[in-house]
C-alpha cells in the first residue's frame, strides 16, 4: 500500500481529483465554524489554509466520477438506483477524528482502502467502529489502528459492541423523515431478533465486556437472516384481511413500495412498473389482494436474479446462439423450465425454481415488453409520436454511438444528450416514494421502456397486426426473447452494452493514433519481423531468381533454351555457388523491401478501414499499390547491383570476372546510376502489390474462412494455409507484371557489343517488341512465378508465425508516460493502446463457441493501476449499507449532522 507522500502516477491523479473538488479554508479563519452552514464543518479543530472536502464536496466528487474519463464511463448506465446521499456514510466512516471534513490524508486513506478486495465491508465496519472507538477513548485506553492489508487478518478478529451497534441503528431510525415508514413502523428492531443471541460472543469470555458480534457474523446476518426479517416486517405492517378468503394480503402498490424500499439499489427500475398480478393464471390473486405465497415467490426471484441471469446466458451458450439469436429467438416458460431441469449439466443444483415462480418471472418480463410497445405506439403516426426519453437512448445506442465519429462535436453532443436523458429517467423514476404509495394511478409513474430496439417493434408489427390500445398477453408472452429476460434480471445490461462500444472505440482509436510511442515501436517491431521473414523467403527461392534474371537478360535463345536448360548450365559451369551469386545484396535489399512493403500495407489497411473495420476492394488495391511504391526507393539500388552480379559470367570476360563485386559495381554506377530503371521498377512493383495483397486477403477470408473480427469465423490459420494463400496470390501478380520486370532488367544491365541500346522505358518496350516479338516480354515468366509465389508464401507465413511467437511487448502507463490530448475534468483521457489495457482481449478464444458474445456480460475492467473507478466501488459500499438497513438511503447532511454530534458527545463524555 502506498503512503500519502508517495509520488506515483496514481497518487498524482488522486491528488488532482482531490484538488478539483476540495474547498480551500480562508486564511483568516483560524478556527472552523461550529455550525453546519451549507455543508460546513464542525467546530473545535484548528484550521489552516489547506484544502478539504466538505460533505457536499465528497458526494459531488463520487457522483461526478462517472465522467472522469473521456474514453469510457464508470457505470453511468446501470439500471438500478443508488441514491447519492448514501455516499455520506463513506464520508463519515473515513473522516479520522470526526473533524467534519476530509483532508488529503483521509482522501489517500480512502483510496488505499478501495484497493482491498473487501473494501465495502471494511468501510461498513469502520462506520460502526467509530462509535466503539469513541466509547473506548472516553474510558481512557487508546484505540489501535487496523492494518487491513495484513493477509493474516480475519474478519473474525474485527468485532463490534452489540449494544452500541444497535444504538447506532436506532439513531439512524430517529433521523428518518419518511412519514410512510414512520407511520407504518417499518423499522427493524434488532432487540426482537431471537436468532441474534447465536451470533453474539463476549471478548476474552468476560461478561462485563458485554456482547459483541464479529464482522463475519454481521455479513452472515445481512446475507441470510435480515432478508427474511425485512419481508416479515413489511408484510406484517402493511397486510390487511381479505374477507373473501379470510387471509392476509397486500395490494400491488404496497408490494411495489416494499420492493423499492428493499431492492431499488440492486434490481432494474423497470420491474416496479411491470407488476400485474391479474395476468397470473397460476396464482389466485389480483392487484388488490396479493397473498403471502406470491409475495415470497416474488422476492425469492429477486434474491436469485444473479442465478437466473447466468441460466439464460448458459441457455444461449448451449444452444450456440449468436447475438442476433439472443435478440430474436423466442423462449417460452416451458423451454426455460425444461432447460433448468435437464439431468445432465444441470445449472441450478442448489437453488430450485417452481413453475409458479417462473410464471411470475415471465409475467414481469411480458408486462415490461407490453408497456414498451404501448409507449412506442401511443399515437397513430409513430414517426411523429412522443417517445419517452429512454427510447432515445435506444436510438442512440443502435445508431449514433455505434456509427458516430468519436472526434466530431456531433458525437460529443450526442453523448452528452445520452447522459442527460439517462439522468432524467433515473430522477423521474426515483420520485417521492410517499407520493407514489398514496397515488391510485400507478401507471402514471414514468416507465422504463428503454431497452427494446426499434427493430423489435418492427418485428412485432410484421408478425401480427396489433391495435395501439393493447397487446395480447399471450402473444407478447410467446414473443419473449432471452434479451427481454436479461433486461429484467441484470441491472448492468445497458451499461454492459455501452462498455463494449467504448472498448471497440478505444481499440479503433489506438490503431490509428500516431501521437504516442507505442505505435512507433509497433512499426519498428513489424519492420524487424518483416525483414527476417523476407530474408528467409529470399534465400529459399534465390536460385530461381538467378535463372529468371539470366533468361531475361539474353536477347535471343542462343545460350539458354528455357528455364530448365538455364539452371542445368549454371550448375555445370559455375556450380551450386553460382546459383547464389549476388545473394549478399539481395539479402541486404530484401530486408527493407519486404519490411517496408508489409508495414506500409498494414498501416494503409488500418487507415483506410471503415468504422466496421472492413476494407473495400479499391482501398485494398490502394493499400497494396502504396506499399509497392514505397519499397522502390530502397530496393532499386540494391537490385541493380544484384542483377549485375548475377549476369557477370555472361557479360564480363573471364579475366575480369573475379574483380567484379558489389563495391566495384556501386563505384562504377555512381549514385544516379543506382536508380537506373527505377521507373520500370515502379511499373512492376505497384501493380504487383496492388494485385498481391488484396488477393492474399481474399483467399484467406473466402477459402479458409479467416476473419479475426467475426466470432463465427476463424481467427487463426495453420502454417500450410498461410503458405497456400501466399503462393496462390503470388501467381497472378508475378505473371501479369513480368513484362515490366523484363524491361527493368534490360535497362539495369549494360548491353553487349552489337546489341541495341535502350533510351528509356518506352524505347525498350518498342525495341524488344520489334526485334524479339511479344513473346520476349514473358521471358523468365515461369521462373518468376515459381520464385515470387513461394517467396511471398514463405515470407508472409514466416511474418505471421513470428508475430505469434514473438508478440510485441505491452506498455503500462505507470512506466511509460505518454502525452495527453484533451483533459476532461480532473483527469486526462485514456491514451493507452487496447493491448495495454486489455491483455486478455488478445488471447485466442478457446474452443469454437458460437456464442462468444461481446455484447453481454463483458469481463474486462478498463481500470489499470493508473485509473480509478470511484463511482462503481462507492456504489458497492452503498449497497452494503442499504442491505444492512434500507434507511441508510436517506443519509443526507442532516442525518450526518446528528451522527457527528452524537459521536462528539460520546468522546466528551466523562465517566
From Swiss-Prot:
Pfam families: Mito_carr. Keywords: Amino-acid transport, Calcium, Membrane, Mitochondrion, Mitochondrion inner membrane, Repeat, Transmembrane, Transmembrane helix, Transport. GO terms for biological process: aspartate transmembrane transport; L-glutamate transmembrane transport; malate-aspartate shuttle. It comes from the Eukaryota. Coiled coil: none annotated. The chain crosses the membrane at residues 524-544, 584-604, 621-641, 663-683, 723-743, 778-798. Solcar repeats lie at residues 521-607, 615-702, 717-805. It is a multi-pass membrane protein. PANTHER family: CALCIUM-BINDING MITOCHONDRIAL CARRIER PROTEIN ARALAR1, MITOCHONDRIAL 2-OXODICARBOXYLATE CARRIER 1-RELATED. Calcium-dependent mitochondrial aspartate and glutamate carrier. Transport of glutamate in mitochondria is required for mitochondrial transamination reactions and ornithine synthesis. Plays also a role in malate-aspartate NADH shuttle, which is critical for growth on acetate and fatty acids. Belongs to the mitochondrial carrier (TC 2.A.29) family. This is Mitochondrial aspartate-glutamate transporter AGC1.
Amino acid at each position: 500500500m502506498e503512503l500519502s507522500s508517495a509520488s506515483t502516477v496514481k497518487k498524482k491523479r488522486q491528488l488532482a481529483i482531490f484538488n478539483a473538488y476540495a474547498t480551500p479554508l480562508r486564511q483568516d479563519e483560524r478556527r472552523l465554524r461550529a455550525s453546519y452552514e451549507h455543508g460546513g464543518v464542525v467546530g473545535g479543530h484548528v484550521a489552516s489554509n489547506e484544502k478539504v472536502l466538505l460533505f457536499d464536496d465528497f458526494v459531488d466528487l463520487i457522483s461526478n466520477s462517472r465522467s472522469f474519463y473521456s474514453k469510457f464511463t464508470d457505470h453511468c448506465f446501470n439500471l438500478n438506483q443508488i441514491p447519492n446521499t448514501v455516499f455520506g456514510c463513506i464520508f463519515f466512516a473515513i473522516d479520522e477524528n470526526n473533524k467534519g471534513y476530509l483532508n488529503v490524508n483521509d482522501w489517500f486513506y480512502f483510496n488505499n482502502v478501495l484497493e482491498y478486495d473487501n473494501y465495502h465491508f471494511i468501510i461498513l465496519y469502520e462506520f460502526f467502529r467509530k462509535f466503539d472507538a469513541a466509547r473506548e477513548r472516553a474510558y481512557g485506553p487508546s484505540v489501535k489502528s487496523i492494518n487491513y492489508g495484513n493477509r493474516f487478518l480475519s474478519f473474525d478478529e474485527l468485532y463490534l459492541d452489540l449494544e452500541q451497534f444497535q444504538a447506532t441503528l436506532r439513531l439512524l431510525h430517529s433521523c428518518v423523515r419518511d412519514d410512510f415508514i414512520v407511520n407504518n413502523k417499518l423499522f427493524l428492531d434488532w432487540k426482537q431478533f431471537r436468532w441474534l443471541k447465536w451470533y453474539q460472543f463476549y471478548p476474552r469470555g468476560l461478561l462485563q465486556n458485554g456482547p459483541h458480534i464479529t464482522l463475519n457474523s454481521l455479513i452472515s446476518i445481512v446475507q441470510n437472516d435480515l432478508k427474511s426479517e425485512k419481508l416479515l416486517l413489511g408484510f406484517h405492517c402493511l397486510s390487511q384481511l381479505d374477507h373473501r378468503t379470510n387471509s392476509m394480503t397486500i395490494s400491488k402498490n404496497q408490494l411495489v413500495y416494499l420492493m423499492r424500499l428493499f431492492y431499488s439499489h440492486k434490481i432494474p427500475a423497470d420491474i416496479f412498473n411491470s407488476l400485474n398480478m391479474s395476468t397470473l393464471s397460476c396464482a389466485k390473486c389480483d392487484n388488490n389482494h396479493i397473498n403471502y405465497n406470491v409475495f415470497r415467490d416474488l422476492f425469492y426471484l429477486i434474491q436469485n436474479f444473479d442465478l437466473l441471469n447466468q441460466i439464460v446466458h448458459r441457455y444461449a451458450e448451449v444452444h450456440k446462439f449468436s447475438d442476433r439469436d439472443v435478440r430474436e429467438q423466442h423462449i417460452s416458460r416451458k423451454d426455460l423450465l425444461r432447460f433448468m431441469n435437464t439431468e445432465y449439466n444441470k445449472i441450478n443444483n442448489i437453488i430450485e425454481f417452481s413453475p409458479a415462480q417462473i410464471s411470475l418471472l415471465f409475467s414481469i418480463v411480458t408486462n415490461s415488453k407490453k408497456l414498451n410497445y404501448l409507449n412506442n405506439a401511443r399515437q397513430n403516426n409513430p414517426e411523429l409520436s412522443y417517445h419517452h426519453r429512454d427510447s432515445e437512448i435506444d436510438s442512440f445506442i443502435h445508431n449514433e454511438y455505434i456509427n458516430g465519429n468519436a472526434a466530431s462535436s456531433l458525437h460529443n453532443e450526442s453523448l452528452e444528450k445520452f447522459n442527460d436523458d439517462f439522468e432524467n429517467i433515473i430522477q423521474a423514476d426515483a420520485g417521492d416514494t410517499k407520493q407514489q404509495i398514496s397515488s391510485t394511478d400507478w401507471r402514471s409513474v414514468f416507465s422504463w421502456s428503454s431497452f427494446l430496439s426499434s427493430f423489435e417493434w418492427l418485428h412485432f408489427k410484421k408478425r401480427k397486426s396489433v391495435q395501439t390500445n393493447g397487446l395480447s398477453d399471450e402473444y407478447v408472452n410467446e414473443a419473449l426473447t432471452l434479451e427481454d429476460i436479461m433486461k429484467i434480471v441484470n441491472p448492468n445490461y445497458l451499461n454492459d452494452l455501452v462498455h463494449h462500444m467504448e472498448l471497440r472505440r478505444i481499440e479503433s482509436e489506438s490503431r490509428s493514433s500516431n501521437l504516442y510511442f507505442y505505435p512507433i515501436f509497433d512499426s519498428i517491431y513489424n519492420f524487424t519481423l518483416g525483414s527476417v521473414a523476407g530474408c528467409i523467403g529470399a534465400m529459399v527461392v534465390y536460385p530461381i531468381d538467378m535463372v529468371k534474371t539470366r533468361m531475361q537478360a539474353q536477347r535471343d535463345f542462343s545460350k539458354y533454351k528455357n528455364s530448365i536448360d538455364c539452371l542445368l548450365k549454371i550448375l555445370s559451369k559455375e556450380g551450386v555457388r553460382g546459383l547464389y551469386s549476388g545473394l549478399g545484396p539481395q539479402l541486404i535489399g530484401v530486408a527493407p523491401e519486404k519490411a517496408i512493403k508489409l508495414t506500409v500495407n498494414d498501416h494503409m489497411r488500418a487507415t483506410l478501414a471503415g468504422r466496421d473495420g472492413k476494407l473495400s476492394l479499391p482501398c485494398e488495391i490502394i493499400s497494396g499499390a502504396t506499399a509497392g511504391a514505397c519499397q522502390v526507393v530502397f530496393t532499386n539500388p540494391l537490385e541493380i547491383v544484384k542483377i549485375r552480379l548475377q549476369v557477370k559470367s555472361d557479360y564480363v570476360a573471364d579475366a575480369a570476372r573475379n574483380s567484379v563485386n558489389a563495391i566495384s559495381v556501386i563505384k562504377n554506377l555512381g549514385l544516379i546510376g543506382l536508380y537506373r530503371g527505377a521507373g520500370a521498377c515502379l511499373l512492376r512493383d505497384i501493380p504487383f502489390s496492388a494485385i498481391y495483397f488484396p488477393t492474399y486477403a481474399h483467399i484467406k477470408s473466402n477459402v479458409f474462412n479467416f476473419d479475426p473480427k467475426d466470432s463465427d469465423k476463424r481467427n487463426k490459420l495453420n502454417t500450410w494455409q498461410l503458405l497456400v494463400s501466399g503462393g496462390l496470390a503470388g501467381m497472378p501478380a508475378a505473371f501479369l507484371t513480368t513484362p515490366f520486370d523484363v524491361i527493368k532488367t534490360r535497362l539495369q544491365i549494360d548491353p553487349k557489343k552489337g546489341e541495341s541500346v535502350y533510351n528509356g522505358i518506352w524505347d525498350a518496350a518498342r525495341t524488344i517488341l520489334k526485334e524479339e516479338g511479344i513473346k520476349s516480354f514473358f521471358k523468365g515468366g515461369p521462373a518468376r512465378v515459381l520464385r515470387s509465389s513461394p517467396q511471398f508464401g514463405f515470407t508472409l507465413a514466416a511474418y505471421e508465425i513470428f508475430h505469434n511467437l514473438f508478440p510485441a511487448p505491452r506498455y503500462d502507463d505507470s512506466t511509460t508516460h505518454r502525452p495527453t490530448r484533451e483533459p476532461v475534468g480532473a483527469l486526462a483521457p485514456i491514451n493507452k493502446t487496447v493491448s495495454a489495457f486489455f491483455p486478455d482481449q488478445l488471447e485466442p478464444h478457446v474452443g469454437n463457441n458460437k456464442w462468444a458474445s461481446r455484447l453481454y456480460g463483458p469481463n474486462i475492467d478498463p481500470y489499470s493501476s493508473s485509473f480509478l473507478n470511484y463511482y462503481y466501488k462507492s456504489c458497492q459500499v452503498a449497497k452494503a449499507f442499504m442491505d444492512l438497513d434500507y434507511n441508510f438511503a436517506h443519509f443526507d447532511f442532516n442525518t450526518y449532522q446528528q451522527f457527528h454530534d452524537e459521536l462528539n458527545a460520546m468522546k466528551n463524555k466523562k465517566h
